[in-house]
C-alpha cells in the first residue's frame, strides 16, 4: 500500500477538520453529484424504488444511513493517514461488498470525482490544486485496496 507525503497528510487533515464535524450534509452533496454523473447508480440502492425523485431518495432515512457510513470510511482514512495499511483488510472487504451488490469498478472513479466536487463546494477558496492532488492521492490508495477486494470477490464467485 502506498504512502502519502507529509504535505498531503497535512492538507487532508486541515481540510477534513471542518468537514468531518458535519459529515451528512457534505455526504449528501457528494451523492447528489454522483447521481448527476451516473443516475443508474441510484438503482443499486434497493430502498430507493419508492422514491419520487433523487432528492427524495437522498433524504430518506435509509439513504442517509448509507451516506453516514461512507463519510465514516473517509473519516477513518483521514484518521489513519499515518498507518493506512491498518485499513487494508477493511477496504478489501468493502470492495468485496461493493462487488456483491453490483457496483462496478468504473463507479469508483465517479465516486472520486464526486468527492472532489464536494470538497470544492464545501471548501471554496481553500480548495487548491495541491489540496485536490492530496485527496486524489488518498482516494487512489483507498480505491486500489477496494478494487483488489472487488476483484478477489469476483474470482471467488467464478470458482
From Swiss-Prot:
InterPro entries: Globin, Globin-like_OT, Globin-like_sf, Globin/Proto. GO terms for cellular component: cytosol; mitochondrial matrix. The keyword Metal-binding applies. Keywords: Cytoplasm, Heme, Iron, Metal-binding, Mitochondrion, Oxidoreductase. It catalyses: Fe(III)-heme b-[protein] + nitric oxide + H2O = Fe(II)-heme b-[protein] + nitrite + 2 H(+). Heme b binds at residues 66, 98. Residues 3-151 form the Globin domain. Its EC number is 1.7.-.-. It is an enzyme of class 1 (oxidoreductase). Monomer. Homodimers and homotetramers. Mainly monomeric but also detected as part of homodimers and homotetramers. Monomeric globin with a bis-histidyl six-coordinate heme-iron atom through which it can bind dioxygen, carbon monoxide and nitric oxide. Could help transport oxygen and increase its availability to the metabolically active neuronal tissues, though its low quantity in tissues as well as its high affinity for dioxygen, which may limit its oxygen-releasing ability, argue against it. The ferrous/deoxygenated form exhibits a nitrite reductase activity and it could produce nitric oxide which in turn inhibits cellular respiration in response to hypoxia. Belongs to the globin family. This is Neuroglobin. The gene is ngb.
Amino acid at each position: 500500500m502506498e504512502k502519502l507525503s507529509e504535505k498531503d497528510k497535512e492538507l487532508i487533515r486541515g481540510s477534513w477538520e471542518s468537514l468531518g464535524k458535519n459529515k451528512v450534509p457534505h455526504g449528501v452533496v457528494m451523492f447528489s453529484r454522483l447521481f448527476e454523473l451516473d443516475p443508474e447508480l441510484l438503482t443499486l440502492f434497493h430502498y430507493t424504488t419508492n422514491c419520487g425523485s433523487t432528492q427524495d431518495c437522498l433524504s430518506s432515512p435509509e439513504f442517509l444511513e448509507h451516506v453516514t457510513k461512507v463519510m465514516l470510511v473517509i473519516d477513518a482514512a483521514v484518521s489513519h493517514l499515518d498507518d493506512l495499511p491498518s485499513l487494508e483488510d477493511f477496504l478489501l472487504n468493502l470492495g468485496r461488498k461493493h462487488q456483491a451488490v453490483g457496483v462496478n469498478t468504473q463507479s469508483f472513479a465517479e465516486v472520486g470525482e464526486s468527492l472532489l466536487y464536494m470538497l470544492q463546494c464545501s471548501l471554496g477558496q481553500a480548495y487548491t490544486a495541491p489540496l485536490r492532488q492530496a485527496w486524489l492521492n488518498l482516494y487512489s490508495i483507498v480505491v486500489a485496496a477496494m478494487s483488489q477486494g472487488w476483484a478477489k470477490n469476483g474470482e471467488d464467485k467464478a470458482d
